[in-house]
Amino acid sequence: MADYDLTTKIAQFLDRHLVFPLLEFLSVKEIYNEKELLHGKLDLLSDTNMVDFAMDVYKNLYADKEIPLALREKRTTVVAQLKQLQAETEPIVKMFEDPETTRQMQSTRDGRMLFDHLAEKHGFRQEYLDTLYRYAKFQYECGNYSGAAEYLYFFRVLVPSTDRNALSSLWGKLASEILMQNWDAAMEDLTRLKETIDNNTVSSPLQSLQHRTWLIHWSLFVFFNHPKGRDNIIDLFLYQPQYLNAIQTMCPHILRYLTTAVITNKDVRKRRQVLKDLVKVIQQESYTYKDPITEFVECLYVNFDFDGAQKKLRECESVLVNDFFLVACLEDFIENARLFIFETFCRIHQCISISMLADKLNMTPEEAERWIVNLIRNARLDAKIDSKLGHVVMGNNAVSPYQQVIEKTKSLAFRSQMLAMNIEKKMNTNSRTEAPTWAAQDSGFY
């Protein structure tokens, strides 16, 4: 299913270390030629210090050749640099191992106060911060993400937000936690990084747009692994104008992930309201991006094309199975998508043949009847089954005037937001220049 693979698009906005899990996934799925993937890994590794990993990949790619001299020499250089940095950093790390320092770090949020404490008790100096940062970055480039995360934490609590490496250290800490699959810590770092980007008054609008675009892509790792991720992704991508604007302007392919999060959301009431807002965005962006997942929503909620929706649902399975971020959502997606088809069909018809429903849901009549019985039993559906006639008779779910007013108000607010974003989007398009220099750097933290 290479036609719908987004790895190349997404990789443009990731640190090179974050691309490795995606390539490993593609290798397992056998979507691409294995040699092409190995070449890709080797290219990514060329600007890192993961020399042993690079040697392993080289052996897999060229089994009959010796490891190049350049790689062997690079390994010697990296080991020497690591030893030197370890020697420089060792006395600094010992300061942080002091129990009193640990207590101070846990109790105070004032980095200046902590710095003064370390200076008074241990002779800590300003240049030690640069040493700590360089060592953390070197550890990261070697693939030692736990070490990088630890030293970046020390660095972060000591430096002010105005420090030249402050923002970079936040990116590095987030990447390290993602690569160690520490999802709670990664969610905290993601929130902290978002607040820093949103409150940054120094960056130009274009730089802020670029930062948010990177954050959107990095956040996929967290949102599709953290228990609260599918709620948070909706709040960030759909209901925060600056991030929705970034998606529409820079990366409409992210609509695949937003749509999946909405469809698989476990809060039924929230899901129904959010769907209405999502449909408007999908319609608006359909000329720039579409895939079976967004087209499924369009077929069902815009065109009311049930046959088209059923066809797209079958295609969705292939897309989900071959998407690194969405493969774990497959069962929830199929279950809820069937429910959406059923609910939409039922709004149009009061009495429905079970055999017709089975056809629309791509199930046997027996499976469809059992599925509907479970929905009724779990209070997710107001309906009765007439087993003799093989019909489902829908109940009457009248919406209160109060609820109608609320929904219309929400709809108006959302339309106003969309109008404002379209104006901003046109202004951004007219004033766009080259991306900030760090966006082109894909080694280290960013």
Swiss-Prot record:
GO terms for molecular function: translation initiation factor activity. Residues 222-399 form the PCI domain. SMART domains: eIF3_N (SM01186), PINT (SM00088). Keywords: Cytoplasm, Initiation factor, Nucleus, Protein biosynthesis. It is found in: Cytoplasm; Nucleus. It comes from the Eukaryota. One of its GO terms (cellular component) is eukaryotic translation initiation factor 3 complex, eIF3e. InterPro entries: eIF3e (IPR016650), eIF3e_N (IPR019010), PCI_dom (IPR000717), WH_DNA-bd_sf (IPR036390). GO terms for biological process: formation of cytoplasmic translation initiation complex; translational initiation. Component of the eukaryotic translation initiation factor 3 (eIF-3) complex, which is composed of 13 subunits: eif3a, eif3b, eif3c, eif3d, eif3e, eif3f, eif3g, eif3h, eif3i, eif3j, eif3k, eif3l and eif3m. Component of the eukaryotic translation initiation factor 3 (eIF-3) complex, which is involved in protein synthesis of a specialized repertoire of mRNAs and, together with other initiation factors, stimulates binding of mRNA and methionyl-tRNAi to the 40S ribosome. The eIF-3 complex specifically targets and initiates translation of a subset of mRNAs involved in cell proliferation. PANTHER family: EUKARYOTIC TRANSLATION INITIATION FACTOR 3 SUBUNIT E. Belongs to the eIF-3 subunit E family. This is Eukaryotic translation initiation factor 3 subunit E-A.
